[in-house]
Amino acid sequence: KGVAKENHYLLKMALYSELKKDLEVLPIYEILVQHYPKKRYWTNLSGLYGQKDRQMDQMGALEAAYDDRLLDKQREFTALSQLLFMFENPRKAAEVIEDGLNQGIVKREEKTLKAAAQYWHAARELEKAKPYYKQAASKSKEGELYVFLGQVHFSLDEFDQAEEAITEGIKKGKLKDEAAAYMLLGQINFENQKWESAIESFRKC
């Protein structure tokens, strides 16, 4: 009886698809996820919400699938973490992307490591952000991520590591704001009582 009921909804959806009425299937998916919470129903429902610019519902559907341990693709983990971050939940965004990285579902590449770093940073978990900034920076062709890493070290009063990271960022180049990087380096040198280096850095601002 249960299978027939599910098949009834699937048949109805097939008919709507034939008639090119794709958005008409949305309420059917809403019923299916309640009674037959399979991964494809959640992800399809999330996609339909996205098409209708219902981002909060789009996130809710993906989050429900994640909480049931149904997600198994990188794009699903990154989409959910981006939506969570957009709706001001950086901690869960960081936990989701980190979970994907730890499971090997999400590849350890610059953009995913940078996302993990920025989500933890936004959640004010600087110790957790540090290793991700470091890994992302080492994969980047630009120095920007080393500057972010330096800012984190500076916030934690780790001045030697901050100096090393900022210097590496300036050396790698292609910074959006090189003057700001030199300003930060000057502040770090000042904290380290390296007066001449501090003055030299401030002059380069």
Describe each PLM feature range.
Residues K1-K204:
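Alpha-solenoid helical repeat scaffolds
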